[in-house]
From Swiss-Prot:
SMART domains for the chain: DNA_mis_repair, MutL_C
Gene3D superfamilies per UniProt: 3.30.230.10, Histidine kinase-like ATPase, C-terminal domain, MutL, C-terminal domain, dimerisation subdomain, MutL, C-terminal domain, regulatory subdomain
Role this protein plays: This protein is involved in the repair of mismatches in DNA. It is required for dam-dependent methyl-directed DNA mismatch repair. May act as a 'molecular matchmaker', a protein that promotes the formation of a stable complex between two or more DNA-binding proteins in an ATP-dependent manner without itself being part of a final effector complex.
UniProt keyword annotation of Nucleotide-binding present: no
Chain residue ranges for the region called Disordered: 408-436
One Gene Ontology term of the molecular function aspect: ATP hydrolysis activity
Organism, as annotated: Streptococcus uberis (strain ATCC BAA-854 / 0140J)
Name this protein carries in UniProt: DNA mismatch repair protein MutL
A GO-annotated cellular component: mismatch repair complex
Matching HAMAP family: DNA_mis_repair
Biological processes, Gene Ontology terms: mismatch repair
Length: 660
């Protein structure tokens, strides 16, 4: 029988580090939380090689005394709790005394610190958990911690690190969450000499949101507030027109601590009710102030899982707060955003059709090969240009948020367009069960589409439409009912499949380039996956903080589709993560065909309906949309006669057969 021994302290710390320190982002999280607990108001994070080479955290907090400095890297040595009762009223982000010892055991650590009441500072250098030296130095009040060669003595952990861009995206996400949880602190994140994130630290949460997600996003966030005897809920949620493809943009904070909680996520979605499209999620920042006795944060090594007493009451409070705030808002999307762009085009407006409350008449333009809606004639002319001094497309947020841009970019802003996301994201989904994240299901669908055989199509004569959704046509074999959305989706799919598959290298130069704004984490991930976009003819170049510029577009993409199209491509690339070029092209064709097709409640004139049927007849497989739904159903003459009892197979009563 093996003998039980007590593990050496260094080995025990390395084992503990496996729970607390999963990746470089974990180091950043723990050290920044310590800086916040030290009442810092300015925190600078400097990263080299995504944190694997170097992580440097500098703050202007209270600092540590010369006596306390060596104790800081001992396990379970902390200044934040003193006895058992303190464990049940934790208000600090850290309290276990595990972070620094864990980091010190798997890296080369350097701590420079000074307090306000000390004439000098202290330096501590440790490697692998062992203190190498401690000396007196001159340093400003606060603390600077440098972590180098992370995981140098745990090669197994280093082996399974993801790409540098992926690890950097995790770091940016951590800093963003901490910034949202503490808008009173000014955060600066610098990666390999390049500034990635910067917040002002004014205490204005909406201004922090603008610094992280962009000015245009912050302008579409509305404030929520609710409280009872146990909880205070406050924060901002996006209008239903502004959504994302995953839950990554939902930030829930309890007493300033970012947490993950499925039930609270569900409460947020319940607050939106039916205003969100299936598979779309809002941008949310909610801060919950709670008595520490009602929340137990000591249940997980990363402290991101929290047990909450009276959780059902809190869920109801959140749902009500969101529902009430949305109820007081005008949820009709603002048309002024695109007014300047629409005036420079022709009077006939070409657009991706949407699902309106009332049916709209569609017309077909053979030159543009697309459907459009005629704009109603106006009694007075309104001319607004982007240069008009009386009209501002991008205003300050509540007169407090100011856009921080370099002078060279400001001067160039007049010659670029700020792209906005399509406002039809929240229309009812024609395919609620389509899930691009389901790899197995998508592979089966793509394989089925690749093996389609060319089919013949009957000659049809269009004669009517029902509810702006279904077309009626007759042929030699009887009556055919066609789903107009599925029909055009099939037509568009084969078009995009052909164009994206070939990826014509011909590009059209844009007269005015477009700017596309993303969050810091998404910006980094897109840089890593830019080759996928290049393969389909989209070339985005970095342009300032978290922004790409598009100077040219593939000739197969209409200029009117650029803004929504590029955002949709990027969203899908972020959603599907690792895909092959072949799979990405196939999924992109499916997605674009669905979003570019006419929806229900659109009445087609005779010419448009006949042209759609003609296009459908030329498809390789006109009988199913890319998702497998039927495009049309067929009733033979015999079927019609049976339905009206004009013929019966025998003289047996249908009532006797149990059919009626």
């Amino acid at each position: 029988m093996s003998k039980i021994i007590e593990l050496p302290e260094i080995l025990a710390n390395q084992i503990a580090a496996g729970e607390v320190i999963e990746r470089p982002a974990s180091v950043v999280k723990e050290l920044v939380e310590n800086a916040i607990d030290a009442n810092s108001r300015q925190i600078t994070i400097e990263i080299e090689e995504s944190g694997l080479k170097s992580i440097k955290i500098t703050d202007n907090g209270e600092g540590m005394s010369e006596e306390n400095l060596p104790l800081s890297i001992l396990r379970h040595a902390t200044s934040k709790i003193k006895n058992q009762s303190d464990l049940f009223r934790i208000r600090t982000l850290g309290f276990r005394g595990e972070a620094l010892p864990s980091i010190a055991s798997i890296s080369e650590l350097r701590i420079e610190t000074s307090t306000a009441d000390s004439p000098y500072g202290s330096l501590l250098v440790a490697k692998g958990g062992q203190i190498e030296r401690q000396e007196v130095i001159s340093t400003p009040v606060g603390t600077k911690i440098t972590v180098e060669n992370l995981f140098y003595n745990t090669p197994a952990r280093l082996k399974y690190m993801k790409s540098l861009q992926s690890e950097l995206a995790h770091i940016v996400d951590v800093v963003n969450r901490l910034s949202l949880g503490h808008p009173e602190v000014s955060f600066t994140l610098i990666c390999d000499g390049r500034e990635m994130t910067k917040t002002s630290g004014t205490g204005d949460l909406k201004q922090a949101i603008a610094g992280i997600y962009g000015l245009n996003t912050a302008k579409k966030m509305i404030e929520i507030s609710n409280a009872d005897l146990d909880f205070e809920v406050s924060g901002y949620v996006s209008l239903p027109e502004l959504t994302r493809a995953n839950r990554n943009y939902i930030t829930i904070l309890i007493n300033g601590r970012y947490i993950k909680n499925f039930l609270l996520n569900r409460a947020i979605l319940d607050g939106y009710g039916s205003k969100l499209m299936v598979g779309r999620f809002p941008i949310v920042v909610i801060d919950i102030q709670i008595d520490p006795y009602l929340a137990d944060v000591n249940v997980h090594p990363t402290k991101q899982e929290v047990r909450i007493s009276k959780e059902k009451e809190l869920m109801a409070l959140i749902s009500t707060a969101i529902a009430e705030s949305l109820k007081s808002q005008d949820l009709i999307p603002d048309a002024l955003e695109n007014l300047a762009k629409s005036t420079v085009r022709s009077s006939t407006k070409y657009e991706q059709t949407k699902l309106p409350l009332q049916s709209s008449k569609l017309y077909f333009d053979p030159q543009k090969n697309d459907f459009y809606i005629k704009e109603p004639q106006k009694t007075t002319e309104l001319t607004v240009s982007e240069e008009s001094p009386n009209f501002t497309l991008y205003t300050n947020i509540d007169n407090t948020v100011k856009e921080d841009r370099n002078l060279d970019q400001t001067s160039a802003s007049a010659s670029v367009k700020h792209a906005s996301r399509s406002q039809d994201e929240n229309q009812l989904s024609e395919h609620p069960n389509l899930d691009f994240t389901n790899k197995q299901k998508m592979e089966q669908l793509i394989s089925k589409l690749e093996n389609e055989k060319t089919s013949t199509f009957p000659e049809l004569d269009f004669f009517g439409q029902m509810h702006g959704t279904y077309l009626f046509a007759q042929g030699k074999d009887g009556l055919f009912i066609i789903d107009q959305h599925a029909a055009q989706e099939r037509v568009k799919y084969e078009y995009y499949r052909d164009k994206i598959g070939k990826v014509d290298t011909s590009l059209q130069q844009l007269l005015v380039p477009y700017l596309f704004e993303f969050s810091g984490a998404d910006f980094i991930q897109l840089q890593e996956k830019m080759s996928f976009l290049n393969e389909v003819g989209i070339f985005l170049e970095p342009y300032g903080m978290n922004t790409f510029i598009l100077r040219e577009h593939p000739i197969w993409m209409k200029e009117s589709e650029i803004e929504s199209g590029v955002y949709e491509m990027c969203d899908m690339l972020l959603l599907t993560n690792q895909v092959s070029i072949k799979t990405y092209r196939a999924e992109l064709a499916i997605m674009m065909s669905c979003k570019r097709s006419i929806k229900a409640n659109h009445a087609l004139d005779d010419y448009s309906a006949r042209h759609l049927l003609e296009q459908l007849s030329q498809c390789q497989n006109p009988y199913n949309c890319p998702h497998g739904r039927p495009v049309l159903v067929h009733f033979t003459k015999a079927d019609m006669e049976k339905m009206f009892r004009r013929i019966q197979e025998n003289h047996t009563s249908l009532r006797d057969l149990g059919k009626y």
